[in-house]
Amino acid sequence: MTRPYRTFSNNKPRRDTERAIKLELESLVSQITRLRTPYCVLCGESNWRELECGHFWHRAMPPTEFDLQNLRTLCRSCNRRHELDPQPYREYMLRDLGEKVFNQLEWRAHSQTKVGYVELFNLREEMRALLAEEKRRVA
């Protein structure tokens, strides 16, 4: 008999499941992104309570879900506005990345590449190290 995915005593996934790794990666890339630019890249808002990690290509595109080139610090309102009017964010990303890198990112986002468990596990280790480095840099 297989063990249940979740136990009744808590609602947390078991350690090192693909879901648990993705949840930790979300937190890691969000922290890294907000440490690198502690203000909204579109409007300049710097109240840390309002800042979020905004995905240019949405999270449902696995190849760029945790790609730091796809993530920028946005305030809550700009992140919501991006869903309805993507043009200002698109223009910013084109300026920031350049056309060549932007097109490569777009290609990766639309590719059907599956990100497997091993890739996620290795990416998590990279992001842990990168976060520690960013925290040392900021401190």
Regions found by a protein language model. Give the residues of each.
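Histidine-centered nuclease catalytic patch
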Residues: V41-R72, H82
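Short Cys/His-centered divalent metal-binding micro-motifs
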Residues: E45-R49, L71-G98
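A boundary/linker detector
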Residues: M1-I32, G44-N47, L105-A139
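Short, flexible, mixed-charge glycine/proline-rich loop motifs
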Residues: E26-R36, T64-Q69
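Short microdomains enriched in Cys/His and/or Lys/Arg
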Residues: R59-L71, L94-A109
